[in-house]
UniProtKB/Swiss-Prot annotation:
NADP(+) binds at residues 11, 85, 119, 150, 154, 181, 183. The active site is at 136 (proton donor), 150 (proton acceptor), 154 (lowers pka of active site tyr). This is Uncharacterized oxidoreductase C30D10.05c. InterPro entries: NAD(P)-bd_dom_sf, Sc_DH/Rdtase_CS, SDR_fam. GO terms for biological process: tetrahydrobiopterin biosynthetic process. Pfam families: adh_short (PF00106). It comes from Schizosaccharomyces pombe (strain 972 / ATCC 24843). Keywords: NADP, Oxidoreductase. It is an enzyme of class 1 (oxidoreductase). Coiled coil: none annotated. Belongs to the short-chain dehydrogenases/reductases (SDR) family. GO terms for cellular component: cytosol; nucleus. GO terms for molecular function: oxidoreductase activity, acting on NAD(P)H, oxygen as acceptor; sepiapterin reductase (NADP+) activity. Its EC number is 1.-.-.-.
Length: 247
Protein backbone atom coordinates (compact mmCIF):
# COMPACT_ATOMS: atom_id res chain seq x y z
CA UNK A 1 0.00 0.00 0.00
CA UNK A 2 1.11 3.60 -0.60
CA UNK A 3 2.70 5.28 2.39
CA UNK A 4 0.35 7.45 4.45
CA UNK A 5 1.33 11.01 5.42
CA UNK A 6 0.14 10.57 9.01
CA UNK A 7 2.27 8.94 11.68
CA UNK A 8 1.72 5.19 12.01
CA UNK A 9 1.87 3.88 15.57
CA UNK A 10 1.72 0.34 16.89
CA UNK A 11 0.21 0.12 20.38
CA UNK A 12 0.13 -3.00 22.56
CA UNK A 13 -2.15 -3.67 25.52
CA UNK A 14 -4.76 -1.47 23.86
CA UNK A 15 -7.97 -2.95 25.25
CA UNK A 16 -8.04 -1.35 28.71
CA UNK A 17 -6.28 0.92 31.19
CA UNK A 18 -3.35 2.96 29.92
CA UNK A 19 -3.44 1.29 26.51
CA UNK A 20 -7.09 2.08 25.85
CA UNK A 21 -6.63 5.68 27.03
CA UNK A 22 -3.65 6.01 24.69
CA UNK A 23 -5.64 4.66 21.76
CA UNK A 24 -8.31 7.25 22.51
CA UNK A 25 -5.68 10.01 22.72
CA UNK A 26 -4.27 9.07 19.32
CA UNK A 27 -7.60 9.51 17.51
CA UNK A 28 -7.31 12.05 14.70
CA UNK A 29 -3.54 12.25 15.30
CA UNK A 30 -2.21 9.01 13.81
CA UNK A 31 -2.90 5.70 12.17
CA UNK A 32 -2.99 3.05 14.90
CA UNK A 33 -2.31 -0.67 14.94
CA UNK A 34 -4.04 -1.66 18.18
CA UNK A 35 -2.76 -4.97 19.55
CA UNK A 36 -4.64 -6.77 22.32
CA UNK A 37 -5.52 -10.25 23.47
CA UNK A 38 -9.20 -9.35 23.76
CA UNK A 39 -11.55 -6.95 22.02
CA UNK A 40 -13.34 -5.00 24.73
CA UNK A 41 -16.49 -3.00 23.95
CA UNK A 42 -14.53 0.22 24.48
CA UNK A 43 -11.84 -0.74 21.98
CA UNK A 44 -14.43 -2.04 19.53
CA UNK A 45 -16.15 1.35 19.66
CA UNK A 46 -12.87 3.06 18.77
CA UNK A 47 -12.39 0.73 15.82
CA UNK A 48 -15.90 1.44 14.55
CA UNK A 49 -15.46 5.19 14.96
CA UNK A 50 -12.10 5.17 13.15
CA UNK A 51 -12.44 2.61 10.33
CA UNK A 52 -9.78 4.19 8.13
CA UNK A 53 -7.17 4.88 10.80
CA UNK A 54 -7.47 2.05 13.34
CA UNK A 55 -6.60 -1.61 12.73
CA UNK A 56 -6.91 -4.31 15.38
CA UNK A 57 -4.48 -7.21 15.71
CA UNK A 58 -5.96 -9.74 18.11
CA UNK A 59 -3.58 -12.05 19.90
CA UNK A 60 -1.18 -12.57 22.75
CA UNK A 61 1.79 -10.19 22.54
CA UNK A 62 4.10 -13.18 22.95
CA UNK A 63 2.85 -14.50 19.61
CA UNK A 64 1.97 -11.57 17.33
CA UNK A 65 4.99 -9.25 17.49
CA UNK A 66 6.22 -9.86 13.96
CA UNK A 67 2.71 -10.13 12.52
CA UNK A 68 1.67 -6.80 14.03
CA UNK A 69 4.62 -5.03 12.38
CA UNK A 70 3.78 -6.70 9.06
CA UNK A 71 0.18 -5.53 9.42
CA UNK A 72 1.30 -1.93 9.89
CA UNK A 73 3.44 -2.03 6.76
CA UNK A 74 0.81 -3.81 4.66
CA UNK A 75 -1.98 -1.47 5.74
CA UNK A 76 -0.21 1.90 5.94
CA UNK A 77 3.13 1.47 4.18
CA UNK A 78 5.41 2.50 7.05
CA UNK A 79 5.93 2.54 10.82
CA UNK A 80 6.76 5.65 12.85
CA UNK A 81 6.45 4.48 16.44
CA UNK A 82 5.78 1.58 18.75
CA UNK A 83 4.20 2.09 22.17
CA UNK A 84 4.78 -1.12 24.10
CA UNK A 85 2.39 -1.06 27.02
CA UNK A 86 1.23 -4.66 27.50
CA UNK A 87 2.32 -6.14 30.81
CA UNK A 88 1.31 -8.20 33.82
CA UNK A 89 2.11 -8.05 37.53
CA UNK A 90 1.45 -11.64 38.61
CA UNK A 91 2.94 -13.74 40.13
CA UNK A 92 2.81 -11.85 43.41
CA UNK A 93 4.90 -14.11 45.64
CA UNK A 94 8.09 -14.02 47.64
CA UNK A 95 11.13 -15.47 45.91
CA UNK A 96 11.25 -18.43 48.32
CA UNK A 97 7.71 -19.31 47.27
CA UNK A 98 8.20 -18.60 43.56
CA UNK A 99 6.90 -20.77 40.75
CA UNK A 100 9.66 -20.44 38.16
CA UNK A 101 7.27 -21.25 35.33
CA UNK A 102 5.13 -18.27 36.37
CA UNK A 103 8.24 -16.07 36.29
CA UNK A 104 8.95 -17.29 32.76
CA UNK A 105 5.40 -16.45 31.66
CA UNK A 106 5.72 -12.96 33.09
CA UNK A 107 9.07 -12.39 31.38
CA UNK A 108 7.65 -13.66 28.09
CA UNK A 109 4.97 -10.96 28.27
CA UNK A 110 6.79 -8.09 29.97
CA UNK A 111 10.21 -8.46 28.37
CA UNK A 112 10.69 -10.98 25.57
CA UNK A 113 7.58 -9.89 23.65
CA UNK A 114 8.99 -6.36 23.78
CA UNK A 115 12.38 -7.48 22.47
CA UNK A 116 10.74 -9.40 19.62
CA UNK A 117 8.49 -6.52 18.56
CA UNK A 118 11.36 -4.04 18.74
CA UNK A 119 13.60 -6.34 16.69
CA UNK A 120 11.13 -6.44 13.81
CA UNK A 121 10.23 -2.74 14.15
CA UNK A 122 13.80 -1.41 13.98
CA UNK A 123 14.34 -1.70 10.18
CA UNK A 124 11.17 0.33 9.57
CA UNK A 125 11.84 2.85 12.35
CA UNK A 126 15.29 3.52 10.91
CA UNK A 127 13.61 4.69 7.71
CA UNK A 128 11.25 7.08 9.50
CA UNK A 129 13.62 8.11 12.30
CA UNK A 130 10.87 6.89 14.57
CA UNK A 131 10.35 6.25 18.25
CA UNK A 132 10.20 3.33 20.66
CA UNK A 133 8.17 4.11 23.79
CA UNK A 134 8.02 1.39 26.44
CA UNK A 135 5.95 1.56 29.62
CA UNK A 136 8.26 0.74 32.51
CA UNK A 137 7.59 1.25 36.23
CA UNK A 138 8.94 2.77 39.39
CA UNK A 139 9.25 -0.87 40.42
CA UNK A 140 12.26 -1.06 38.09
CA UNK A 141 14.24 0.92 40.65
CA UNK A 142 12.33 0.29 43.90
CA UNK A 143 11.72 -2.87 45.90
CA UNK A 144 8.17 -4.00 46.58
CA UNK A 145 7.79 -7.20 48.62
CA UNK A 146 6.55 -10.17 46.55
CA UNK A 147 6.91 -8.22 43.29
CA UNK A 148 10.36 -9.56 42.40
CA UNK A 149 9.33 -10.98 39.03
CA UNK A 150 7.67 -7.73 37.96
CA UNK A 151 10.46 -5.53 39.35
CA UNK A 152 13.13 -7.54 37.54
CA UNK A 153 11.23 -7.47 34.25
CA UNK A 154 10.91 -3.69 34.36
CA UNK A 155 14.57 -3.26 35.30
CA UNK A 156 15.36 -5.34 32.22
CA UNK A 157 13.20 -2.99 30.13
CA UNK A 158 15.20 0.00 31.33
CA UNK A 159 18.48 -1.64 30.37
CA UNK A 160 17.03 -2.64 27.00
CA UNK A 161 16.19 1.00 26.34
CA UNK A 162 19.68 2.10 27.33
CA UNK A 163 21.15 -0.35 24.84
CA UNK A 164 18.74 0.74 22.12
CA UNK A 165 19.79 4.33 22.70
CA UNK A 166 23.39 3.33 22.07
CA UNK A 167 22.78 1.02 19.12
CA UNK A 168 20.10 2.98 17.24
CA UNK A 169 20.92 6.71 17.49
CA UNK A 170 18.37 7.72 14.84
CA UNK A 171 15.51 6.09 16.77
CA UNK A 172 14.36 7.72 20.00
CA UNK A 173 13.99 4.93 22.59
CA UNK A 174 12.56 5.75 26.01
CA UNK A 175 11.21 3.86 29.02
CA UNK A 176 8.40 5.73 30.79
CA UNK A 177 7.74 5.74 34.51
CA UNK A 178 3.96 6.14 34.73
CA UNK A 179 3.46 6.45 38.47
CA UNK A 180 0.65 4.62 40.25
CA UNK A 181 -2.20 4.60 37.76
CA UNK A 182 -5.89 3.87 38.30
CA UNK A 183 -6.06 0.70 36.19
CA UNK A 184 -7.25 -2.91 36.55
CA UNK A 185 -3.71 -3.81 37.67
CA UNK A 186 -4.18 -1.63 40.74
CA UNK A 187 -7.46 -3.38 41.51
CA UNK A 188 -5.54 -6.66 41.52
CA UNK A 189 -2.86 -5.23 43.81
CA UNK A 190 -5.46 -4.13 46.35
CA UNK A 191 -7.08 -7.57 46.47
CA UNK A 192 -6.92 -8.96 50.01
CA UNK A 193 -5.49 -12.23 48.68
CA UNK A 194 -2.18 -10.39 48.12
CA UNK A 195 -1.91 -8.90 51.60
CA UNK A 196 0.06 -11.73 53.21
CA UNK A 197 2.69 -11.95 50.47
CA UNK A 198 3.10 -8.18 50.07
CA UNK A 199 2.93 -7.40 53.76
CA UNK A 200 0.33 -5.27 55.48
CA UNK A 201 2.19 -1.96 55.19
CA UNK A 202 2.76 -2.22 51.44
CA UNK A 203 -0.75 -3.50 50.79
CA UNK A 204 -2.29 -0.69 52.85
CA UNK A 205 -0.11 1.87 51.03
CA UNK A 206 -1.77 1.02 47.72
CA UNK A 207 -5.24 0.91 49.24
CA UNK A 208 -4.71 4.36 50.76
CA UNK A 209 -3.59 5.78 47.41
CA UNK A 210 -6.97 4.75 46.02
CA UNK A 211 -9.11 5.95 48.91
CA UNK A 212 -7.28 9.30 49.08
CA UNK A 213 -7.67 9.93 45.36
CA UNK A 214 -3.93 9.96 44.63
CA UNK A 215 -3.92 7.52 41.72
CA UNK A 216 -2.95 8.94 38.34
CA UNK A 217 -5.64 8.92 35.64
CA UNK A 218 -4.83 6.71 32.63
CA UNK A 219 -5.69 9.65 30.39
CA UNK A 220 -2.80 11.66 31.85
CA UNK A 221 -0.31 8.90 31.08
CA UNK A 222 -1.84 8.56 27.62
CA UNK A 223 -1.04 12.20 26.87
CA UNK A 224 2.62 11.63 27.72
CA UNK A 225 2.89 8.40 25.72
CA UNK A 226 1.20 9.99 22.72
CA UNK A 227 3.50 13.01 22.83
CA UNK A 228 6.61 10.85 23.00
CA UNK A 229 5.42 8.62 20.18
CA UNK A 230 4.71 11.57 17.91
CA UNK A 231 7.87 13.57 18.65
CA UNK A 232 11.42 12.26 18.20
CA UNK A 233 13.71 14.11 20.61
CA UNK A 234 17.23 12.63 20.25
CA UNK A 235 18.24 14.06 23.62
CA UNK A 236 15.86 11.66 25.36
CA UNK A 237 16.99 8.43 23.77
CA UNK A 238 18.11 5.68 26.12
CA UNK A 239 16.50 7.31 29.14
CA UNK A 240 14.04 6.28 31.86
CA UNK A 241 11.72 9.30 31.94
CA UNK A 242 8.99 10.58 34.24
CA UNK A 243 5.58 10.92 32.57
CA UNK A 244 4.90 14.34 34.13
CA UNK A 245 7.58 15.93 31.96
CA UNK A 246 5.48 15.43 28.83
CA UNK A 247 2.00 16.70 29.68
Amino acid sequence: MAETAEKVILLTGSSKGIGLATAEALQKKAKVIAVSRSLTPELETLLIQNPDSFVHVKGDVTEVGKASIETAIKKFGKLDSVILNAGVLEPIAKIADADINEWRKLFDINFFSVVETVKYAIPHLRKTKGTIVIVSSGAAVRVFPAWAAYCCSKAAINMLVMNLGSEEPDIMSVAVRPGVVDTPMQVSIRNDSNKEAMGGDTHNFFKELKTSGQLVAPQDIAKALSFLALNNNPKLTGQFVEWKSFV
